[in-house]
Structure formats: structure tokens, C-alpha cells
Amino acid sequence: MKKMLALLVIAPLLVSCSGNKGNTDNEEFLKDTNAFDILMGQFANNIENIWGINEVLIAGPKDYVKYTDQYQTRSHINFDAGSITIETLSATNSVASLRQAIITTLLMGDDASNTDLYSDANDIQISREPLLYGQVLDNTGQAIRWEGRAASFADYLLQKRLQKRTSGLHVIWSVTIQLVPNHLDKRAHKYLPLVRKASERYGIEESLILAIMQTESSFNPYAVSRSDALGLMQVVQHSAGRDVFKMKGKWGQPSRSYLFDPEQNIDAGTAYLSILKNSYLAGIENPTSKRYAVITAYNGGAGSVLRVFSSDRDRAVGIINNMSPGDVYQTLTTKHPSGESRRYLNKVNSAQKNYRR
């Protein structure tokens, strides 16, 4: 498994029109961001000290990574590639460490609110409705829901598929498990009832919600980013989260545990799409042009979308309204200052077409 040193420098968060808030909010944002930056730096240092500089692996939007056993063992689910890799450095209890990690990973639920991905705490909750149920088949071709079947499969893997490699001075023992080919569709289907509920509540297309979830997290409920965006729809507490709470008449911003709850995350992400659609970008008349603007704004902020067309917001809306949807799409995917935002519109738009079928 290819390892990459995680980027730990926290880039400034790209927020929507909510960026024009007072100094108090900005000070709170900087305080929280600096604290998260320090936490990430300490966490990466712990991993580097134990695994080595070339083996630093940290959770991301589409990668679940959990360390246990004093950082000696880790579980990595690559939700994009559809693979699970369980590894350990333990020289004396390698088989036992791997066995426990395999069982726990196969049976964990999708509520990440009580799991700390930035520590070695053994806090993973086994669920009667495992996140990976139906996405992993054991050696007999059966889905895994209960501990007995997970334990039997773990024993099979350790007997038949145990691998050994060296990295620097370390010997690393590992087992790799492939998810079923349609794992992405299975995760999407799992969240469809929650998506439908949010779609009806906020008037946002189901296909758009699903496309954003796929692009943001590949339907990983444990998703985190280096800018501390959280959960399935990668909601940032200090910007989108604060706007959503304001819309709901609540003070402050959602907690991390709030955004790690799948239902609340999907609700918050969809509510923010409705804010972009009906408030920040309400003046855009053509529904297709507005959809392109909303998608791009979800990634890079409504203000940056409008500035692509003019520094004056009212004039920007007028320019957009005088353009065809195709020209709006072309402009946003070629002239937006953020390469990530340019690519984001293309990815979400393509994914949405698949969910409309």
C-alpha cells in the first residue's frame, strides 16, 4: 500500500458569503483552527516516531484510518479504491492484534461521534448494523454481520493471506481485504432514506445531495479533512455549520459529534445547499446556471463564484443571467481561481448525471 506523508499545514478555509462576519467569529475561527493544527501536528509526530517518516498515514475525507495498541496497529479503509488494510508493528502479538482489528473494523457502525481518529484509543463501537455489511464477503461468499462470522473470516485471512514487509527498521505484518465491486452503490443506498428526507425538507434534488456526498467523502461517515470538514457532506463547523444553525434559529455552531451523526450531517449539508440556492445565489434566474453556481459555491464559497464574473455582486448576477448555462459552466470550470473548485464542479456534475438515471 502506497503511503504518503499527510499534509499538516492548515490552509485557510474557503467560506461562502458568511465570510463577512464580525471580528468575534473570526477570532473564534482562528483559535479553533490553530488548536486543530496543533492536534494534527502532535498526532502525526506520534505516528512518525513509531512507524517512521515514510509510514505516516492519517484519516482523510475518503480514508478511514484508526490506530490502536499504543499506535502499533492500524486499520485503513480506502473508500475510493474499495480496500481494507489492517497492519501491525507488534513483534510479540502480531496475529492477535491483527485479528482483533479485523473483527472490529468489519463490525463497526457508521456513527463516528464517539470515535477519536486522532488518538490510539480503542473506542470503536461494534454495531448490529455494520457500516461494511454487504460490502465485504467472507471466504464462503457470505456477508458479515455477527462477531462469530467476523472472527472466522479473520482466522481464515491470517492463515491464508498474512503478508510481511519491511519499512526502514520495521517489520510490518498486514492483511488486505477487497470490498465488493459495487461497494459505492451499497453505501449510497444505505443513506438514501436520509437523503430523501433532507431533499423533501429543503427542496434540493436527491441526485445533487448524493453527488456531493460521493465527491466529498465517497460515503465515508468518518470523513475528516485537514481543514476539519466533517462527515458525509464535509460540513465545516465554523462556516457552513454556523450558517445552518443561524437559519434554524440556533446559537453558535454544530459540535463535532453533531456532524459525525449521519442524519444530522446530511441535514446540515443539504440545508447549506438551500442557503446557497435561496439566499446567497438567489438572484441567478436559470435553474441550471444556478445549480452550477451552487455546486461550485459548496466547495469554494458563494463570494468566490460571483467574483469570477465581477467584483460587484449585483453586476455578477446580471452577467450570469445574460449567459447561457453552458457558458456559465465553461467560465466556472476554466476561470475560477481555485483549481479544486474548477474540478469540483466537473466531478459533482458528472456524478449527478449517474444518480439521475
Swiss-Prot record:
Quote the CDD domains the UniProt record gives.
LT_MltC_MltE
Keyword hit for Secreted: no
EC number per UniProt = 4.2.2.n1
Disulfide pairs here are none
**Cellular component per GO, a single term:** cell outer membrane
Query: What's a Pfam family in this record?
Result: Mltc_N
Family note:
Belongs to the transglycosylase Slt family.
What name does the UniProt record give this protein? Membrane-bound lytic murein transglycosylase C
Organism whose genome encodes this protein: Pectobacterium atrosepticum (strain SCRI 1043 / ATCC BAA-672) (Erwinia carotovora subsp. atroseptica)
